[in-house]
Swiss-Prot record:
Pfam family, one: ATP-synt_DE_N
Quaternary context: F-type ATPases have 2 components, CF(1) - the catalytic core - and CF(0) - the membrane proton channel. CF(1) has five subunits: alpha(3), beta(3), gamma(1), delta(1), epsilon(1). CF(0) has three main subunits: a, b and c.
Similarity comment: Belongs to the ATPase epsilon chain family.
Range of residues in the leader sequence: none
InterPro entries (alphabetical): ATP_F1_dsu/esu_C_sf, ATP_synth_F1_dsu/esu, ATP_synth_F1_dsu/esu_N, ATPsynth_dsu/esu_N
SUPFAM superfamilies: Epsilon subunit of F1F0-ATP synthase C-terminal domain, Epsilon subunit of F1F0-ATP synthase N-terminal domain
One term of GO molecular function: proton-transporting ATP synthase activity, rotational mechanism
Entry membrane topology: Peripheral membrane protein
Listed name of the protein: ATP synthase epsilon chain
Natural source organism: Psychrobacter cryohalolentis (strain ATCC BAA-1226 / DSM 17306 / VKM B-2378 / K5)
GO CC list: plasma membrane; proton-transporting ATP synthase complex
PANTHER family documented for this protein: ATP SYNTHASE DELTA/EPSILON CHAIN, ATP SYNTHASE EPSILON CHAIN, CHLOROPLASTIC
Record key words, sorted: ATP synthesis, Cell inner membrane, Cell membrane, CF(1), Hydrogen ion transport, Ion transport, Membrane, Transport
């Protein structure tokens, strides 16, 4: 079976390094799947779940808050702003953050604070979707 090397790195740590058979992430134009032999490219990532499948069929779900995906002939590199394994996300804290962001939207008239609340809300929703994808595959 053909494989690619993959590295997933955030500003804080390297989350994944090893061989993969497939990677699926959310780019700015929608979901992108990367298999061995994929055309080289660089794209921006949107907040959301990224799935990494190993050659033995195991799948790891990682939340990325955004970043860059680079595909080379034998290597995939993800440079994420923030990245966490899905099983490390705390659903209750994320639900609370979403409620707080929604409340901020109701109470804000300042454009800057409204944009910050919208960004926080989008991040919370993306994290919750990541948790659901992780739970559905388990």
């Amino acid at each position: 079976m053909a494989t690619l090397q993959c590295r997933v790195v955030s500003a804080r740590e390297e989350l994944y390094s090893g061989e993969i058979s497939m990677l699926i992430a959310t780019g700015t134009e929608g979901e992108i799947g990367v298999l061995p032999g994929h055309t080289p490219l660089i794209t921006l990532l949107k907040p959301g779940a990224m799935r990494v499948q190993t050659p033995d069929g195991e799948e790891e779900v990682i939340y990325v808050s955004g970043g860059v995906l680079e595909v080379q002939p034998k290597m995939v590199t993800v440079l994420a702003d923030t990245a966490m394994r899905a099983h490390n996300l705390d659903e209750s804290k994320i639900v609370e953050a979403r409620k707080k962001a929604e409340q901020m939207l109701v109470n804000q008239s300042d454009t800057v604070q409204t944009n910050a609340a919208l960004a926080s809300l989008a991040e919370s929703v993306a994290q919750l979707q990541t948790i659901r994808k992780y739970k559905n595959r388990a």
